[in-house]
Amino acid sequence: MRVAMISMHTSPLEQPGTGDAGGMNVYVKNIAEQLERRGVIVDVFTRATRPLQGEVVNVRPGLRVINCVAGPYEGLSKEELPTQLAAFTGSILAFCREEGVSYDLIHSHYWLSGQVGWLLRDLWQVPWVHTAHTLAAVKNNSLADGDSREPESRRICEQQIVDNADLLIVNTDQEVQDLIEGYDATTCAIRVVPPGADVDRFTPGSDRATERSRRELGIPFRTKVIGFVGRLQRLKGPQVLLRAVAELLDRHPQQQLAVVICGGSSGAGGNELERLQLLAEELGISRCVRFLAPRPPEELVGVYRAADIVAVPSYNESFGLVALEAQACGTPVVATRTGGLPIAVDGGKSGLLVDGHDPSDWADALGKLVLDDDLRIAMGEYAPSHAAKFSWQASAEALHKLYEELPPAGHRGERQPAG
């Protein structure tokens, strides 16, 4: 089987935590690699963002990333990419003609790629699978203060994808409900395939390894560490974490506490790092906040291990891969009760779930784990067993099976309703 994966707006080879690169990059990269290990030939098509990028990157014997020229390499925001959908599609078609390659199936990721997948399905007459990753209707119902609503044009495009895709892949049952309630989707076109974590890479460290990670970050031995990993944007809630920590320190001024925020600015403006630094100064906690540049997985392990707690105060997450990775490293998680996070975190066992984004409520939850060593240690010991329930191998196996079961293009109505 040969699969064309479409990831227009961000490459799986980009560093997560910068620009538009995040959980979706991790998802596409790991799923593609695991499918290739199962004998599937995968070509991932993405938009070239650098002139010397090289059109084709051979990642593995049966996995390539193809950088398609569509518009200027730099200067286009994600919001402007719809103007390049035709150019991107044309680049894919030109590549396929030149290579003499054809595909058995298309799998698009995010709504921009979905529009391309829709056209290619009708041209190639092969089944088309789509994974949304995020939905405008859901994001608009859970905006952070200062965030702009997703445009109606995006919601319309998503509706077209839902109405026409042969199969929709979602992370959780909550996403099934989101598609039904927000887009009038039919369950016969939806299947749930939870994502995973690289549980071979993200593992608990020895006491010595943890001490080494803390030394590298310049954190004193007895200081409690709260970590945050992800793109720096309001949607991810780092500002909520800073306000909660300020309140926690007001309540317990003698507590030795450090906040480690690992990620780069993302979204319109690109100056969220400066805003967060200014907020930390205004709150009087800049002395205990460290900002780290995004790190590759082999270095990110050390950040997770150095943390006593990882906070995921997102306004919405379709799943929450950071939460899984942290737990796999033996670090309990405090996360918002939203989207897929109640699945990613076993509330009360591997971490705590918080309703909403009131800094006082977050200070309560963080304080429980900062001040109660026994509770925090018990949750950290349980966390890896919860994370182990989710693996990329299992995700790819389930996805591969669904690929093979798909009827010819345009016949999704013949499928049986999801059980």
From Swiss-Prot:
Keywords: Glycosyltransferase, Magnesium, Metal-binding, Transferase. It catalyses: 1D-myo-inositol 3-phosphate + UDP-N-acetyl-alpha-D-glucosamine = 1D-myo-inositol 2-acetamido-2-deoxy-alpha-D-glucopyranoside 3-phosphate + UDP + H(+). Its EC number is 2.4.1.250. CDD domains: GT4_sucrose_synthase. It comes from the Bacteria. InterPro entries: Glyco_trans_1, Glyco_trans_4-like_N, Mycothiol_biosynthesis_MshA. GO terms for biological process: mycothiol biosynthetic process. GO terms for molecular function: acetylglucosaminyltransferase activity; D-inositol-3-phosphate glycosyltransferase activity; magnesium ion binding. The keyword tRNA processing does not apply. UDP-N-acetyl-alpha-D-glucosamine binds at Q15, P16, G23, R231, K236, R295, E317, E325. 1D-myo-inositol 3-phosphate binds at H9, D20, A21, G22, G23, M24, N25, K78, Y110, T134, R154. Mg(2+) binds at Y304, R305, A307, T331. It is an enzyme of class 2 (transferase). Homodimer. Belongs to the glycosyltransferase group 1 family. MshA subfamily. Catalyzes the transfer of a N-acetyl-glucosamine moiety to 1D-myo-inositol 3-phosphate to produce 1D-myo-inositol 2-acetamido-2-deoxy-glucopyranoside 3-phosphate in the mycothiol biosynthesis pathway. This is D-inositol 3-phosphate glycosyltransferase.
